[in-house]
Amino acid sequence: EMCIRDRYTNYHNNTEEVIVLFDWFQLASKKEKRMIQLRRYLHQYPELSFEEKQTHDYIVNQLSQLSCDIQTPVGRNGIKATFKGKGEGPTIAFRADFDALPVQELNDVPYKSKNDGCMHACGHDGHTAILLGVAEIVNEHRHLLKGNVVFIFQYGEEIMPGGSQEMINDGCLQDVDKIYGTHLWSGYPTGTIYSRPGPIMASPDEFSITIQGRGGHGAKPQETIDPIVIMAEFILSAQKIVSRTIDPVKQAVLTFGMVQAGSSDSVIPDSAFCKGTVRTFDTNLQNHIKTKMDKLLQGLAVANDITYDFNYIKGYLPLHNHQQAYEVVKQAANDMHLRFNESDLMMIGEDFSHYLKVRPGAFFLTGCGNQDKNITAPHHNPYFDIDESSFKYAASEFLKILELENVL
């Protein structure tokens, strides 16, 4: 399980000392079957965000077999497990999320979801299984701990406001020096690790707008205030916010995903409704887009005698990796001979960002796609699956991080 890295003589007391280097990949590989077993159980019994009662109990049951302090519930139904070392090393936290999605699974696999209309279609079952595997390995080597290891199992990542802020408010990062997390990613092949310093994921904001006009007969538009035409005008004008008012080297997205109005060919409705999303990596841009949308609506209201309701919900914070923690992720991957790549900026959101607002740390992606096994479906898709052989790579990455952080 280990190999001797160095052997030298300590001339002060004339003894030969050995520095030991663990083969974390070998240890993680030995835990592979166990992690797969954990993941397959979780995959069969998915639960929606903020409703994860059975999942919570299952995780607590696994942790209660280990020598760690378990704190629960943290927030609504989060779990914090702490392994305490004897030395002066830091306290490093790892986080896994465990909620599922309202998706009907279409995979024909022995571990298919048994909960109708609910599926682990984003890999959170894998995240939880990996961290439980890492916790078991840490438990087996707890006598060597120079610092403390905290495992944070988080509910409700998929739906705003997200579970992370509630868990932070309830003290899950108390005494934690640094935090790391991963997301299994089917778009990247197994055996790869992706990350980047600074911004990596966006803030996923949501908005909804109702334009209130005055309905009437389709043949007598002069007697109406047509909300459909005004909504169309707003949607087209809003396209200029990103293209004409934002520095082209900065990233932003404004997308309308839903428009609803009317129910008949010859009736102009009273109102029109739309919903959409705004994605940015920077809160100044986020505020700029919101303000510009509101000004457009104000102008249309004055010009057309309409009223409107503009509801803008700020999503998770943009996810920004801390430089030094990113370097640790990169070095760990290179030391473990994993294929490390610098990630592209991603317009998706992830509430791990809230942990990084209050503690240094880094988030990385672990490739779990495998074309040979036909595991290529995107996240949130009814055919989504993960290459379970990716678990040992993520687990060895976490263990190597503990070594580099002087905890193990």
Indicate where each model-derived feature is located.
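Metal-dependent amide/peptide-bond hydrolase catalytic core
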Residues: 232-408
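Non-cysteine beta-strand/loop elements that form the S-adenosyl-L-methionine
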Residues: 93-95, 207, 363-369
